[in-house]
UniProtKB/Swiss-Prot annotation:
Name of the molecule in the record: Carbamoyl phosphate synthase large chain
Domain of life: Bacteria
GO process terms (BP): 'de novo' UMP biosynthetic process; glutamine metabolic process; L-arginine biosynthetic process
Region Oligomerization domain, residue ranges: 402-546
Tagged with keyword Amino-acid biosynthesis: yes
Gene for this chain: carB
Ligand binding (ATP 1): R129, R169, G175, G176, K208, I210, E215, G241, V242, H243, Q284, E298
UniProt keywords, alphabetically: Amino-acid biosynthesis, Arginine biosynthesis, ATP-binding, Ligase, Magnesium, Manganese, Metal-binding, Nucleotide-binding, Pyrimidine biosynthesis, Repeat
InterPro entries reported in the protein's UniProt record: ATP-grasp, ATP_grasp_subdomain_1, CarbamoylP_synth_lsu, CarbamoylP_synth_lsu_oligo, CarbamoylP_synth_lsu_oligo_sf, CbamoylP_synth_lsu-like_ATP-bd, CbamoylP_synth_lsu_CPSase_dom, MGS-like_dom
UniProt xrefs under Pfam families: CPSase_L_D2 (PF02786), CPSase_L_D3 (PF02787), MGS (PF02142)
Annotated region (Carbamoyl phosphate synthetic domain), positions in chain: 547-929
Organism whose genome encodes this protein: Bacillus cereus (strain ATCC 10987 / NRS 248)
Record-stated family: Belongs to the CarB family.
Biochemical pathway: Amino-acid biosynthesis; L-arginine biosynthesis; carbamoyl phosphate from bicarbonate: step 1/1; Pyrimidine metabolism; UMP biosynthesis via de novo pathway; (S)-dihydroorotate from bicarbonate: step 1/3
Binding partners and assembly: Composed of two chains; the small (or glutamine) chain promotes the hydrolysis of glutamine to ammonia, which is used by the large (or ammonia) chain to synthesize carbamoyl phosphate. Tetramer of heterodimers (alpha,beta)4.
Length: 1072
């Protein structure tokens, strides 16, 4: 049926900030949906709270609201805009939950708004565990034995009947939040309590564990005419028991017989039809490896992480087509945008193998529990494509950017068989590497299968890789062996180490022997029809399908998988850079490996290469395309780290030169440059040994800030207050030597300022200056940023502008630069300069209207700032106040300390904007998930060094009617200041104590600052973790606390007795 003409305006709900379980895939799907609806002539209104996305660019929709995704704000937008319909199925779990809340509140009915795509009843049937189970029973579809529970007693009675292990699945949550596998009563109490707390409807499904079955996913589409197709089916290498977002996944499925494939396909189509879903849907199934028994695990009635993967794996743009189906078009009316000949009702066919490996944040959080279960922990993922599974897997391994080029990790070589067995059974992020190590050490496939029930097919593939390693080592210099190894995806890096040569020597050896990969096209139809997509992957085969044009081209390096410190902000900059290259008349080529992002949508660039970002893989593309040069400054540290090797290969780095990049990153060169420019910086030195570090710290004086050089996201950065902490850091956090020095700076407790600027070598243009609420010492990515600065004098602002211009010119920056300053005792010091795009680029671009990545790209391509209508100086400040607030995923990562410091911990960000700082802060805090009640109780436990400062804060909480709770030490200080306080027992007390208050939800805020000595077993750590587990806002920085107080005070009417007012006035008269 043709598209609907009875609706004109559609509100699309975004997915909000990036958190574990909901990452950049919704920027991709949301952007596609908005463009798709606009193509059909609808007016599109978008609401999302995340400024770091392409989706929230003003060009994506007709009207863009960057506001909190809460009932209060979304209702206000609906009442103001009066859309005809809302489309919530492209905004992840956030979008679905928002639609349910809007419907229940009555606002949709009040404003006559209908829900498109998937009916409310279908959302509830798929998301409500009880309704879903009933539907499956009606369809005669098997589900594991299960029970819906609302409290612990119901959980006990189910377990007594069915036995352990059981899986807990909370209703209406994201990424398995709050869920898990329980093997005993202790785990049952902990996980059920957590699950009920995280479910917005206080409901969990308890089901008998079917861990060990194969986990299969079907990505299906259906339209209003009941046409339904399977876009892609995927198989998890990890059996059931590990969340699919934490599983290694391959597409298409590799181990199903035709009968099994058709059986599960029919089930998936039957379910999507029964739910009446119009659009995309993801069905997760479990299959017993020894029979045809299967179970339906769950259904996501929306576009999901898996649909982003399926879209990139097949080239079939699910979100784009789901949006068209939502407005009434049918699959047999929509042309497949890939072939531009066939229709969307043709099921895609693949003649290659796709592998997805999750990217976990454990390199950032060494104390985190690495065990994988039903609650997701990965922040992002990589995808790779090969002609066989071995090639595909090894390409994915080297895409992870953990400095790994092969399926082996040195530290696993020491493991004995018993340890390997335990870790393979338990499943952690290194399981596949441990399986390979076990095979190297002679453990049989049968034993490994017994331990973890991984299919023999996958174990055989790992064994093939291990056997090939032996071949490579036994045949040094043999070209036939080299050819076979390359066909299996072995890297030059691995072969060089095995043959005792350099990577460059292997590369040259291959070129001399014409041993180079070809590029194949991703075309949705296994080459059955001609395809129009410029979307390629490399493989060692005969025919090359990537045709080089005679146009001048520029290569942009993407930023790889989403991880803490390098988020979707860099993808935003990459996409804008690609658009600018096209505007400037060049062919834009992008290399990236993240299936979740907008940059890997083949319609963005002229050519997309889905490849690992290693020197070998990038050089293959450059050798073929022979571009004018490569842009590295938008791909975060990933791309910057490739610059030197690319230049060694004779590749031109466009923009800031390698020498100047190095001058900003190398400590001694940077110091020399600052001295020459007369710009002050905190006293600091470089240490290459532990002894040197101790001597430097003594000379500078504690506290000192220590960090390795060349890092992103403050990795392994710490403030240390005394010598034993420094020794602990040097021993545990870094491996210091001449090539990897450690930087040691005096730690200045001052106001931190962040500046983004664009330089063309002559002119330096500054779109914005941001002030951080938390003082220096908290990583800029974890600070609340405010634009324009609220407390800087004009004199200090001028100093900052002068220093920025001097640095842009003095460091010969061509393109973007990001500078962090600290204001200490009314003097501006430079902390660091990053000669690249920073994570604040999208935020400032949206606020100021200056498309920073676009302008910087054109500068890099030779169009100076004046030609583009900008000059030297500071862009006029906006009237409104904008706040960038960090969002954390601590609830997903057990045993991680939530204290803020110089190492970045946030996964995403939101924006709040309004006419006053207080209102903007309120929006930013609410959007980031912090509840701001106007009354209640606050627990205060602070370190001795913070007691004095905490008194003023406590007094202000008391003034607005909050009840103060504190342990004996802090309580005594409060009583001495005549501030009423209730004493609570410390956490080691047998009686009712501080943790009980948090668990029972009797505190609205916990203020807890760090006591020195960082062992996680400490009291403070337990208080902070208990707060996170129970959803209580835990404030570890007094600066953040003050910001929240400002908001609370602005929301509270003053309530003083007349006597207090007259006393104050008399006091003022006396002192006048």
């Amino acid at each position: 049926m043709p598209k609907r003409l009875d609706i004109n305006t559609i509100l699309v709900i975004g997915s909000g900030p990036i958190v574990i379980g909901q990452a950049a895939e919704f920027d991709y799907s949301g952007t596609q949906a908005c463009q798709s609806l606009k193509e059909e002539g609808y007016k599109v209104i978008l609401v999302n709270s995340n400024p770091a996305t392409i989706m929230t660019d003003t060009a994506t929709a007709d009207k863009v609201y960057i506001e909190p995704l809460t009932l209060e704000f979304v209702s206000r937008i609906i009442r103001k805009e009066r859309p005809d319909a809302i489309l919530p199925t492209l905004g992840g779990q956030t979008g679905l939950n928002m639609a349910v809340e809007l419907a229940k509140s009555g606002v949709l009915e009040e404003c006559g708004v209908e829900i498109l795509g998937t009916k409310l009843s279908a959302i509830e049937q798929a998301e409500d565990r009880d309704l879903f189970r009933t539907l499956m029973q009606d369809l005669n579809e098997p589900t594991p034995p299960s029970e819906i529970i609302h409290n612990l007693d119901e959980a006990y009675s189910f377990v007594n009947e069915i036995g352990y292990p059981v899986i807990v699945r909370p209703a209406f949550t994201l990424g398995g939040t709050g869920g898990g596998i329980c093997h005993n009563e202790e785990e049952l109490i902990e996980i059920v309590t957590s699950g009920l707390k995280h479910s917005p409807v206080t409901q969990c499904l308890l089901e008998k564990s079917i861990a060990g079955c194969k986990e299969i996913e079907y990505e299906v589409m259906r339209d209003s005419n009941d046409n339904a197709i399977v876009v892609c089916n995927m198989e998890n290498i990890d059996p059931v028991g590990v969340h699919t977002g934490d599983s290694i996944v391959v597409a298409p499925s590799q181990t199903l017989s035709d009968r099994e494939y058709q059986m599960l396909r029919n089930t998936s189509l039957r379910i999507i039809r029964a739910l009446g879903i119009e659009g995309g849907c993801n069905v997760q199934l479990a299959l017993d490896p020894y029979s045809f028994q299967y179970y339906v695990i769950e259904v996501n009635p929306r576009v999901s992480r898996s649909s982003a993967l399926a879209s990139k794996a097949t080239g079939y743009p699910i979100a784009k087509l789901a949006a068209k189906i939502a407005v009434g078009l049918t699959l047999d009316e929509i042309v497949n945008p890939v072939t531009q000949k066939t229709y969307a009702c043709f099921e895609p066919a693949l003649d290659y193998v796709v592998s997805k490996i999750p990217r976990w944040p454990f390199d950032k959080f060494e104390s985190a529990n690495r065990t994988l279960g039903t609650q997701m922990k990965a922040t992002g993922e990589v995808m790779s494509i090969g002609r066989n599974l071995e090639e595909s897997l090894l390409k994915a391994v080297r895409s992870l950017e953990l400095g790994i080029y092969h399926l082996e990790l040195d530290h696993l070589k020491e493991l004995d068989k018993e340890t390997m067995k335990k870790r393979i059974i338990k499943a952690d992020d290194e399981r596949l590497f441990i399986v390979a190590e076990a095979i190297r050490q002679g453990v049989t496939k049968e034993e490994i299968n017994e331990w973890c029930e991984m299919d023999f097919f996958f174990l055989q593939k790992v064994e093939n890789i291990v056997n090939m390693e032996r071949e490579v080592k036994a045949n040094v210099g043999n070209m036939e062996v080299l050819q076979t190894a390359k066909e299996m995806g072995f890297s030059d890096h691995y072969i060089a180490a095995a043959w005792n040569k350099t990577e460059r020597e292997i590369y040259d050896m291959r070129k001399e022997n014409n041993m180079t990969p070809v590029f194949k096209m991703v075309d949705t139809c296994a080459a059955e029809f001609e395809s129009a997509t410029p979307y390629y992957y490399s493989t060692y085969a005969e025919e090359n399908e990537s045709i080089v044009t005679d146009r001048k081209s520029v290569v942009v390096l993407g930023s790889g998988p989403i991880r803490i410190g390098q988020g979707v902000e860099f993808d935003y900059a990459t996409v804008h850079s690609v658009w600018a290259i096209k505007e400037a008349g060049y062919e834009a080529i992008i290399i990236n490996n993240n299936p979740e992002t907008v940059s890997t949508d083949f319609s963005i660039s002229d050519k997309l290469y889905f490849e690992p970002l290693t020197i070998e893989d990038v050089m293959h593309i450059i050798d073929l395309e022979k571009p004018e040069g490569v842009i590295v400054q938008f791909g975060g540290q990933t791309a910057i780290n490739l610059a030197a090797k690319l230049e060694e290969h004779g590749v031109k780095i466009l923009g800031t030169s390698l020498e100047d990049l190095d001058r900003a990153e190398d400590r001694d060169k940077f110091e020399a440059a600052l001295t020459k420019l007369g710009i002050p910086q905190p006293v600091g030195k470089t240490a290459t040994t532990v002894e040197q570090a101790v001597a430097i710290a003594e000379e500078i004086g504690y506290p000192v800030l220590v960090r390795p050089s060349y890092v992103l996201g403050g990795r392994a950065m710490e403030i240390v207050y005394r010598q034993e902490e420094l020794l602990h850091y040097m021993k545990n956090a870094v491996k210091v030597h001449a090539d990897h020095p450690v930087l040691i700076d005096r730690y200045m407790v001052g106001k931190e300022i962040e500046v983004d600027a664009i330089s063309d070598g002559e002119n330096v243009f500054i779109p914005g200056i941001m002030e951080h609420i938390e003082r220096a010492g908290v990583h800029s990515g974890d600070s609340i940023g405010v634009y324009p600065p609220q407390s800087l004098s004009e004199k200090l602002k001028e100093q900052i502008i002068e220093h920025t211009i001097a640095l842009g010119k003095g460091l010969n920056i061509v393109g973007l630069l990001n500078i962090q300053f600290v204001v200490f005792e009314n003097q501006v010091y430079v902390i660091e300069v990053n000669p690249r795009a920073s994570r604040t680029v999208p935020f400032l671009s949206k606020i100021t209207g200056v498309p920073m990545a676009n302008v910087a790209t054109k500068v890099i391509l030779g169009q100076d700032l004046v030609e583009q209508g900008y000059g030297t100086g500071y862009h006029p400040e906006e009237k409104e106040v904008y706040v960038k607030a960090p969002v954390f995923s601590f609830a997903k990562l057990r045993s991680v300390d939530t204290t803020l410091g110089p190492e970045m911990k946030s996964t995403g960000e939101v924006m709040g904007k309004d006419l006053t700082l207080e209102k903007a802060l309120y929006k930013g805090l609410v959007a980031s998930g912090i509840n701001i009640p106007t009354h209640g109780s606050v627990i205060i436990t602070v370190a001795d060094k913070d007691k004095e400062e905490a008194m003023e804060i406590a007094k202000r909480f008391h003034e607005i009617g909050y009840n103060l709770l504190a342990t004996a030490g802090t309580a005594q200080s409060l009583t001495e200041q005549n501030i009423p306080v209730q004493v609570v027992n410390k956490i080691d007390s047998e009686d009712y104590n501080l943790l009980d208050i948090i668990r029972q939800g009797k505190a609205q805020f916990v203020i807890n600052t760090l006591t020195k000595g960082k062992q996680p077993a400490r009291d403070g750590f337990r208080i902070r973790r208990e707060s996170v587990e129970n959803g209580v806002a835990c404030l570890t920085s007094l600066d953040t606390t003050r910001a929240i107080l400002r908001v609370l005070e602005s929301m509270t009417f003053s309530a003083h007795s007349m006597k207090e007012i007259t006393q104050t006035k008399r006091h003022e008269v006396v002192h006048a």
